[in-house]
């Protein structure tokens, strides 16, 4: 049984930055550090930070005065940001810069009174944060998930519309929704550059290549990770058995029976240690040496806030 590794896979620049912000805050300021929502959607990462003293909360009111608060990589609404500002809190923003780009698009539309349509998944924290950048009562902010939603949508002024997207969507599904938007609202304006982030696009492209070779595909990622779910869906659409797993312990021997090639990838919030554990589990089930597939090289890095870049002095 050959083990094939998708390339690229795992951590993206935004996730790396968000985790580093929490780690640096813990190093510089000690415990506790409060984080609004899971900093990234991965159980292993969140549990590790929790063990080190991070406290994950959903409501700003749960943070005591004078505490340090970090916003998750998914971003927050303007209302949440304003609530934090009104409190005696030190705030560090771990919002992915590519999510912030979409926030700015929405804020500009709100300021100009342009109605805005967001393509995204209802209830996802990134969507809630992005929708929460719009405040102009004379305009309008709408959420659509499918072409069907587009055809049912009613807006105030079809000649004054723009759209943007969640960063972690299926590329193919999103283009289908965009096509519907352009057909329904011919004058609608889209972003100058695609809102779906480079890491989402690259990992989806990599899992397509992986699915061409593999009989079974394992996606390392948590159930609440949007981009990880999209990877599993892509492999399934390619006709392959695909499993979204949190860890190597989830793998059942029956899943790989009769498979000659087993593929492994990881969502953008899944650390490489989990992939290595999956490889070891597959080797125990008869897998050979893992082979890296060719793919796009990624060299994007997002800096942490300057306040967190200072060196921690070691005390003898």
UniProtKB/Swiss-Prot annotation:
Keyword NAD present in the record's keywords: the answer is no
Q: Check the record and name the HAMAP family matching this protein.
A: IspH (MF_00191)
Pathway involvement of the protein, from the record: Isoprenoid biosynthesis; dimethylallyl diphosphate biosynthesis; dimethylallyl diphosphate from (2E)-4-hydroxy-3-methylbutenyl diphosphate: step 1/1; Isoprenoid biosynthesis; isopentenyl diphosphate biosynthesis via DXP pathway; isopentenyl diphosphate from 1-deoxy-D-xylulose 5-phosphate: step 6/6
Q: Where does [4Fe-4S] cluster bind?
A: 12, 96, 197
- EC number(s) per UniProt? 1.17.7.4
Q: Which UniProt keywords apply?
A: 4Fe-4S, Iron, Iron-sulfur, Isoprene biosynthesis, Metal-binding, Oxidoreductase
Please give the organism. Pectobacterium carotovorum subsp. carotovorum (strain PC1)
The protein in question is named: 4-hydroxy-3-methylbut-2-enyl diphosphate reductase
Top-level lineage group: Bacteria
Name the cofactor(s) required for activity, per the record: [4Fe-4S] cluster
